[in-house]
């Protein structure tokens, strides 16, 4: 991190701490993602027709939500997010499908949150990946004759960081948040068409050390007691 960014972060934290102060309220907060950072999360790529193919990627889409319970300045939360990732490769001549990848990432996080402020508040924290999380990829191999399949991923792990700004009035809060999720996984590709194509140098992917980072802008409401 550059010196300018570090100074800006220190200044922002100082302003927030000074403006918000300690909270004595009990809060229940609900947040939902309204936007996902545009990024190519594709895991697989075709190697047979690289020079004569075109690739299109749909913007990743995330749904789900977070629920937090804060007692004064500390609280717990649960977050469930589902991110859809799609990428397709076709020939430039004839528009024939070469490879279509559709990945569904389901993440469940247990969050620890800290909060300050009452009329204007600042909440931040971290989450760890919990049970029920999964990463599945559906592959359509197009013209090459290999059967389509869905690959499962194993050894899923990860964590998350988040921050939320809030404005309080008449027992309710309006909330604006940002969340970053870091996911690691390995592919269970034993006996799969993907492994056959990889051995034949027709398909490229990493079976271990897969890393996916997603970022969401969130909006929400809160109730205070």
Roles of regions detected by a PLM:
Residues 1-27:
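Cleavable N-terminal export/targeting peptides
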Residues 6-8, 62-64, 160:
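Short beta-strand-initiation
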Residues 14-17, 122, 225:
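Structural signature of transmembrane alpha-helix termini at the membrane-water interface
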Residues 19-92, 222-224:
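Short glycine/proline- and aromatic-enriched beta-strand/turn motifs that initiate or cap beta-hairpins
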Residues 37-43, 83-91, 133-139, 183-194:
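Outer-membrane beta-barrel proteins
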Residues 45-52, 93-98, 144-145, 194-201:
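Flexible coil/linker segments and helix-coil junctions enriched in charged and small residues
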Residues 65-172, 212-214, 223:
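Gram-negative (and chloroplast) outer-membrane scaffold detector with strong preference
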Residues 155-161, 166-225:
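Predominantly the C-terminal beta-signal and adjacent terminal strand-loop region
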């Amino acid at each position: 991190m550059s010196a300018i960014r570090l100074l800006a972060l220190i200044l922002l934290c100082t302003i927030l701490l000074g403006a918000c102060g300690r909270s004595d309220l009990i809060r229940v907060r609900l947040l939902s993602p309204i936007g996902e950072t545009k990024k190519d999360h594709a895991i697989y790529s075709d190697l047979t027709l690289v020079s004569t193919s075109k690739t299109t990627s749909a913007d990743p889409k995330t749904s789900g939500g977070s629920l937090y319970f804060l007692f004064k300045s500390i609280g717990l939360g649960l977050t469930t997010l589902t991110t859809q990732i799609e990428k397709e490769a076709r020939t430039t001549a004839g528009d024939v499908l070469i490879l279509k990848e559709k990945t569904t990432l389901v993440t469940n996080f247990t969050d620890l949150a800290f909060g300050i402020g009452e009329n204007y508040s600042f909440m931040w924290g971290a989450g760890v990946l919990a049970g029920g999380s999964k990463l599945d990829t559906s592959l359509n191999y197009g013209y090459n004759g290999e059967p389509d399949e869905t690959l499962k991923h194993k050894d899923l792990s990860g964590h998350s960081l988040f921050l939320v700004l809030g404005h309080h009035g008449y027992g309710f809060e309006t909330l604006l948040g940002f969340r970053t999720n870091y996911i690691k996984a390995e592919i269970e590709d034993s006996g799969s068409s993907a492994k056959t194509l990889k051995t034949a140098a027709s398909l490229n992917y990493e079976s271990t050390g897969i890393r996916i980072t997603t970022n969401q802008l969130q909006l929400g409401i809160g109730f205070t007691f």
